[in-house]
Amino acid sequence: MEQLLHYVWKHKLFPLSPLHTTDHRQVEVIDPGLHNRNTGPDFFNAKIKIDGMLWVGNIEIHDKASDWYLHGHEKDERYDNVVLHVCGIIDLEARNSKGEPLTQMQLSIPENVLRHYQELLSIDQYPPCYQIIPALTRLSVHSWMSALQTERLSQKTEAIAERVKKCNGDWEYAYFVTLARNYGFGINGEAFEQWALSIPLHSVDHHRDDLFQIEAIFLGQAGLLELSTIPERYQKDALNDGYFSKLRNEYLYLQHKFSLAPIDYKLWRFLRLRPQNFPHIRISQLANLYFRRQASLSHLLEATTVKEVIGVLKTSVTPYWETHYTFGSESIRNEKHISPFSLNLLIINTVIPILFAYGRHRGEEKYCDRAFEFLEELKAENNHIVRMWQQCGLEVENAGDSQALIQLKKEYCDKKECLRCRIGYEYLKRK
């Protein structure tokens, strides 16, 4: 409950009068102070009046007064300028490192705030706060959605910055790895990232003009050219499959040449995966993209509109995969172009974060601005999270909105971070 006490104090969600210290002096809260999330007192530079006298200093908040000693504050000089010790329960007198007694005040959590908080924590299908969404002003919703959108983009930027470190500062390589990860479309994202990191692009570049060799390296590094990785019912046909044999022999030669180590085939997940999303198909599409030099960051940076980006990312499989989903099993011919739906997701999860991260890194605002422009122009995602919020009454007009709502669900609702949510705040302060 200490976290909730912090919240009640920060937002002054308590009756402003009468408030009294344990020795019956009247307290008036003018400014609750600046919330400190690091070590030290909980609130800095608060302004309070005690019996009419103004005090400026720090506030410490605990469930029980005895927590002061439990946390060792009586030995810590940083807590000597605490002007008020606010507690849910006062069970003893507390003193600072100088031996001076603290001014203490009991603060109860208002019944309505406690009730609403418990409702928020008992989330089932919908967060209970959805009831107040229709009553929120358009401005407050727009402001919160904008903040969530930026927060989500910043999180993705941090992930890309870490990827750039793994790639020794090579942004082209980091872009390829990010693109590959998102070709996994969630289920195989981690496997695709490990696969991309296993490919030494500087070496592969020597064979960039040969699509067959690129596909051999790409499929070989995925562990997909081993006979044991092919379903048993197709293995006999795969042995008689000339393309499989040629790819395998070419990979063995290139593996030796570049000392390549493939990833573990078991990383790939096939259960409940549509054949269109099989790693073989996605890797062939990436090989084609790489061969046409469309998988390069420099090429992407030249694209100034969504239409141009789509032109950069459009790809299909090599001829063999038009009639196959796996080795040794022929299927009806299908060119297997990457779908508009998948392109939309790739731009949202790859292109936009890369533009934003690269723009920040280089201090070039035009790329950051372009990222936000693309978010406003692209269609919203259509998934269970977005549909849930739409049913709750929130309007979803573009990809920026859907990204904001995914951030809200994953980082606030799922983690029970209602006290950091602006909708949660409106819900808690209701009577």
Regions found by a protein language model. Name each.
Residues W55-E93:
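Aromatic- and glycine-enriched beta-alpha-beta binding-site module
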Residues M1-Y7:
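N-terminal "leader" segments that precede or initiate the main folded domain
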Residues Y7-S66, Y79:
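N-terminal ordered "arm"
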Residues P32-R37, N45-I50, D67-K75, I90-N96, ...:
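Catalytic micro-motifs at enzyme active sites that drive phosphoryl/nucleotidyl and oxygen chemistry
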Residues Q403-K431:
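Cysteine-cluster motifs in flexible loop/terminal segments that predominantly coordinate metals
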Residues D80-V82, V86-W144:
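Compact, glycine/acidic-enriched structural inserts
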Residues A65-D67, I90-L92, E111-V113, F185, ...:
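Short loop/turn segments at secondary-structure transitions that flank enzyme active sites
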Residues Q149-A404, E417:
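Hydrophobic, aromatic-lined core segments that form the binding pocket/scaffold
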